[in-house]
Regions:
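Conserved, well-ordered alpha-helix/loop/beta-strand core segments that scaffold catalytic motifs
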Residues: 337-351, 356-357
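Short, Lys/Arg-enriched N-terminal segments with co-localized hydrophobic residues
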Residues: 1-12
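Glycoside hydrolase catalytic-domain groove-lining segments
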Residues: 114-128, 243-275, 282-284, 295-310
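Bacterial N-terminal signal peptides
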Residues: 24-33
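Bacterial N-terminal signal peptides that target proteins for export
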Residues: 14-23
């Protein structure tokens, strides 16, 4: 068994002269280290953070945001501009933004096939004069199967509940993104029942982005378009958290989606979804579950020298270097993408979600009825500055 270092020192230092010499050497080394450190620190150069030039942007937590590319030209106006508002994030919603439609998110389905968290139309306030659509979601593949397959006896209850909840709304949007492939026919008949019960109120259905027709696609644009009044294409998440880093919605990818969609239905059948958010990726992920040997090996490989205990339970810390890559959207990228959609003949866009945006976007994006909102930028900046003051 290896003898601890402190025990070795204690056994070797048996005579007083050796101990005295050893102590003197330690003091001398410590003084030398302090002098060297002080000298190094004394002449350490001072660097200042400056704004990077040559078209490279250095983002900072300051407002207004600094662009490396200025927006120019005319504002982009659409027939319809939708914005999604989460019922749990109402404070992020500004009812003065130039929207024609609000998607209120969301009426959920629980494990028993019951509607829960059904929002009220009044949540968006009385200032907004546009249309408000109830959005319904089901965030589980197995639960989606359970809810839309008639043999389980819950589908009728869900349809009835949604039709009752939508009475105070202007329309219903189905955002069920995890329908199993074998449930395609059940999904279409589910949509037909909803459409029949809605009467003159519009039914919109959210579908993932497609650049071509897929075999046995449960989200077939052609089949869903025969039932729904409108199709909302979620033209984002080209790259997601679990995959390689990249744009949330690159321009080339979005152009392919826009070109394909028109081969199935006319442009006025669609609402094109745009992202307000971004994502960050790292080249390393340290989260994992390990056996004792793995924990021990990891500590050794990362030069852990101290094991601490909390009421007997061991734990340690070490630092690793991570390369980070972030992709996001600002007013410039959103305006460019919106112009592309409009140029291709699309008249309706939607944003996921309100409160995540670069507020300058509302100087450039608007609807043909009310135009853009030049005051929104200043309103947003003021609100953000007030939040910063509260923190300080």
């Amino acid at each position: 068994m290896e003898i601890p270092l402190n025990r070795q020192i204690g056994e070797n230092m048996t005579n007083k002269s050796f101990a005295t010499k050893f102590l003197g050497m330690c003091i001398l080394l410590a003084l030398c280290s302090v002098c060297v450190f002080a000298e190094a620190k004394k002449y350490e150069p001072v660097t200042e953070k400056t704004i990077t030039e040559d078209g490279v942007m250095l983002p900072g937590y300051t407002y207004p945001y600094k662009w490396n590319s200025e927006i120019s030209g005319d504002p982009v106006l659409f027939e319809e501009v939708w914005g999604y508002v989460m019922i749990s994030r109402l404070k992020d919603y500004d009812d003065e933004t130039p929207l024609t439609d609000v998607g209120l998110f969301a009426a959920e389905v629980n494990s028993y096939g019951e509607l829960t968290n059904v929002p009220k139309r009044s949540a968006v306030g009385t200032k907004f004069k546009g249309r408000v659509h109830l959005v319904t979601i089901c965030e589980s593949t197995s639960l989606s199967h359970f809810c839309i397959d008639p043999k389980y006896g819950v589908r009728d209850k869900i349809v009835e509940g949604l039709l009752e909840a939508v009475e105070e709304f202007d329309g219903l949007q189905v955002d069920w993104e995890l329908i199993p492939g074998r449930d395609a026919d059940n999904f279409y008949s589910f949509l037909k029942e909803l459409k029949k019960g809605l009467g003159k109120k519009p039914l919109t259905v959210c579908v993932p982005a497609r650049t071509k027709t897929l075999n046995q696609d449960v989200y077939s644009y052609e089949k869903i378009g025969k039932i729904a009044d409108r199709i909302m294409i979620m033209a984002y998440d080209e790259h997601w958290t679990g995959g390689p880093a990249g744009s949330i919605a690159s321009m080339d990818w979005c152009e392919k989606i826009a070109d394909y969609a028109k081969t199935v239905w006319p442009a006025n059948k669609y609402i094109f979804g745009l992202p307000f958010y971004g994502r960050i990726w790292g080249n390393k992920s340290v989260k994992q579950a390990l056996a004792f040997n793995g924990m021990n090996r990891t500590a050794h490989e990362n030069n852990v020298v101290t094991i601490e205990r909390e009421r007997g339970v061991p734990h340690y810390n070490y630092t690793v270097s991570v390369d980070v890559e972030g992709w996001y959207e600002d007013a410039y990228s959103i305006v460019e993408r919106s112009r592309m959609y409009k140029k291709k003949g699309y008249k309706c866009i939607a944003f996921w979600r309100m409160g995540q945006e670069d507020v300058a976007v509302w100087d450039w994006i608007g609807n043909k009825k009310t135009g853009t909102d030049p005051l929104t930028v200043q309103i947003g900046i003021k609100a953000l500055e007030e939040k910063e003051e509260e923190k300080n």
